[in-house]
Design a protein with these regions (language model features):
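A donor-sugar binding/catalytic signature common to diverse glycosyltransferases
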Residues: 8, 20-23, 264-313
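Nucleotide-sugar donor-binding patch of glycosyltransferase catalytic domains
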Residues: 297-340
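C-terminal amphipathic helix plus adjacent low-complexity
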Residues: 323-384
Length: 384
């Protein structure tokens, strides 16, 4: 079975991150059995309109590294080549309504007309992750097209009626491969940096949008840590930075916070970092989901929209995320997620960590996205 995944970069590394992780997850299922889900003899192609962005999160070489994983990474324009048009996917995933090239859509429609008994491609529109209630009803809804094909809307989510979230190789993280023996098992991109952290320091990873009030937030972290006699090593991921004034303040001897710059690192290395930090500040969909699999407290710097739709999306998630927590943690966590002072949530970090692990187990019980999407494809194959 051939899987074709189409990705256009909108949210910088968020869209690319999800598509690259999905391709890796499907490739992994094709070569092994994970949670009793198998994807036999699959061939995976990933079409992307900006391979430079993909390279950043794929060991600097998406094409080469993809090939080592059984993934053929191609530029968007390749989808209109005669070779590709003559072998369109059995399953076609357009990520985040990216609109497939017209010649490719025409080739999809012609696939059944040229060969007797040929099955049409299973066409899936992979939507953005949401916790809003309407996703339960919209998930897997078909949308008949005027060329005779149907497109199915696939909604990732946090309920049994939605499509789950991507797991990838996180079961290896949670099984202890990354966490045994201190930092001895850290990937090369992180080993020296982690070994240089101060003993018993709390660790925070930061991957944020430029609009975030990061300087003020870090100042509150510093004040909270000082009040509790603790030290904090803060990893500024992906070459992000803070103001010169903040850098100067945290370079003083009486500062609890130490800033550590990190370049872009591969996805699996970032997963490792999240797993060893005490709290993670994340932004786009991919890092947002990985923080949840880490089973650690996190703050979601959701991308702001002019119509304030992001507030609806954030509140819908927080309602589900803190649903089973104590009233005190819920109140504290809600404020923390909206950039509240660290002095308010710092005393509750242990309780928040325990809650985060419970939430991670809930996600696992719902089933992961790659397994659910494969189940859907198999059901379509049987019914056709």
């Amino acid at each position: 079975m051939r899987w074709d995944i189409f990705c256009q970069i909108v949210d910088n590394y968020g869209d690319a991150g999800v598509c690259w992780r999905l391709a890796r997850a499907l490739s992994r299922l094709s070569s092994s059995s994970v949670n009793n889900v198998e994807c036999d003899d699959s061939r995976i192609r990933l079409f992307c309109d900006d391979l430079n962005v993909l390279n950043v999160i794929a060991h600097g070489d998406a094409v080469g590294h993809g090939a080592s994983l059984g993934i053929e990474v191609l530029p968007w324009s390749a989808a209109e080549s005669p070779v590709i048009l003559g072998s369109v996917g059995d399953v076609v995933i357009e990520a985040f309504a990216c609109h497939l090239p017209k010649p490719y859509i025409e080739a999809m429609a012609q696939k059944t007309s040229k060969k007797a008994f040929a099955k049409p491609p299973i066409w899936i529109n992979l939507e953005y992750l949401t916790a809003e209630a309407w996703a339960d009803d919209m998930h897997l809804m078909p949308s008949p097209q005027n060329n005779g094909l149907s497109k199915y809307f696939y909604f990732p989510g946090f309920t049994p009626k939605t499509g789950g979230v991507l797991l990838g190789d996180w079961d290896e993280v949670s099984s202890g491969r990354f966490n045994s023996g201190g930092f001895k098992s850290a990937p090369p991109s992180l080993s020296l940096i982690l070994e240089s952290c101060r003993p018993r320091s709390k660790k925070i990873s930061v991957f944020h949008y430029k609009q975030a009030p990061l300087d003020a937030w870090l100042d509150s972290v510093n004040q909270a840590a000082l009040a509790h006699g603790e030290m904090v090593d803060v990893f500024l991921c992906a070459d992000q930075n803070v103001s010169e004034a903040t850098q100067t303040a945290f370079s003083l001897a009486n500062s609890a916070v130490k800033l550590i710059q990190l370049p872009f690192i591969p996805q699996e290395d970032y997963d490792y970092l999240l797993s060893v930090c005490d709290i993670n500040l994340v932004r786009g969909e991919d890092s947002f989901v990985r923080a949840q699999w880490a089973g650690k407290p996190f703050i979601w710097d959701i991308y702001p929209q002019s119509d304030l739709a992001h507030e609806v999306k954030l509140n819908a998630f927080l309602e589900r995320y803190f649903e089973a927590s104590s009233a005190e943690l819920r109140s504290t966590g809600l404020a923390a997620m909206k950039w509240g002072s660290a002095s308010n949530w710092w005393p509750h970090l242990n309780a928040w960590t325990s809650h985060s692990e419970v939430w991670r187990q809930k996600l696992m019980s719902l089933g992961h996205l790659e397994g659910k999407i494969l189940d859907f494809v198999k059901s379509q194959e049987i019914s056709r």
